Amino acid sequence: MSFYLKLITVSLFFFFCQSCNESVKKSKKPNFIVFIADDISWDDFGCYGNKQVKTPNIDNLSSEGLIFNNMYLTTSSCSPSRNSIMTGRYPHNTGAPELHTEPPIDMVSMADVLKDHGYYTVSSGKFHMGEYARRGFNLIHDKKEVNGKGGEKKWLNVLENRPKQKPFFMWYASYDAHRDWDNSEFSGTHNPDQLIPPEYLVNDRQTRIDLAKYYDEINRFDYSVGEVVDELKRQGVFDNTIIMIMSDNGRPFPHSKTRVNDQGVKTPFILVYKNENILGITEGLVSSIDIAPTILDYAKIEISETFQGRSFRKLLTNPRKPFRNYVFAEHNWHDYEAHQRMVRDKNFMYIENNRNHIAQLGPLDAINSLSFESLYIKNISGELNEIQKEIFINPRPKEEFYEMQNDHFQRNNLIQNEAFENQINDLKKILNIWKVETGDSEPMKLTKHWYSRKPGSKVKNDLNKSIELLKTKHHGIRGEFPGQINNAVKINHKGPF
């Protein structure tokens, strides 16, 4: 064989092999890892502009993926939010719109569907979703003594011992950064004296200590994410793994967790998929109910009608393209009686407060915090500014309306501004359509306060003992759920998009 014939033969061989590799890469089902943090706000990662918190691994990873600037949760409450993500349904459509409630056992989850289609599915860390969700996992690590203080202890072990012939779906759910804070090797990572609290908190020593401990737990979450990414690369599966990093609700401080504004329901969301080299930043409006359909879309699985969200896969190929016209959120009972609804479009946010006679102090863990104590004391002495004392207003406005381009933290309520009358009416109309189409309701007898909201009945640095002291006569008694009268758990309508 001549030299040139050999050269041509070898070249064709390598071309054929390369083509085969590309074909296999494109046809092979992707793996999925969802890192879901506990109580971390959208702007508490470095890659979202926070220069005080230390998140080097997440920041580095974000440079290899797509940062979502407008990913909205459907609620700012732990179990309702997680169930909403897992089912792709609004909280009142899951049958579990309140904290510590569970969807019916026959509810369909994305883990369920993935498992049925050959995926190896694991939940490791905080579970908090209910029995229906257990059906969807081959393996569950949900015991604190096994998972470690941050809930991340088994993450590497799960990856190392997975069946290598199967694609996988990992639901890696950290306890970080939920109160109470604990002591670990990450404690002291952030110096309180070098921190400046958000403008709605008091800038005093004990608030800075509170914030530093919160940031320390975020740093632990970041470290664990980095460990998993390194292991994916070691195994050679990083490129074919779609990684999502997010939180279930806002930070556990006053003005944040349980709110339906950006500090409560806007989540950090980073998606990395090296096989498609998705890079950049998207401003598109996306809802957390869209996550499950997107995962199923990438897995080439038909998306059933029970999923109210829609796949945002097309947004990934063109991040500048708009996705949703509207996102919706709801706040129902979380320690205290509540009923709020929110809708936002590209430019405006409208909030409906249906229990506006109740001051919006925050959840129980926030009320028992050092940060709240400072706010409470300085409110009595009249030392708070307008933003800080907002949580004590009673009654609150029945309605709120914000211009989002110039009011990123929703400080200037424009509901009485006649210049925005048309925009206000438009969003009110859309919200009402959403309520009707998805079967939402406002029950007369909602679940009432399970705990007192008066500081002073607490045991410092012991939330569990404080809870016992703060229980009311209504503790343990549930009222009617939003959507219950309309059997919303059986309604699959997606609502306005």
Can you describe what each PLM-predicted range is?
Residues 443-457:
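Short, charged, surface-exposed hinge/linker loops at domain edges
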Residues 2-14, 20-393, 397-400, 408-429, ...:
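Formylglycine-dependent sulfatase
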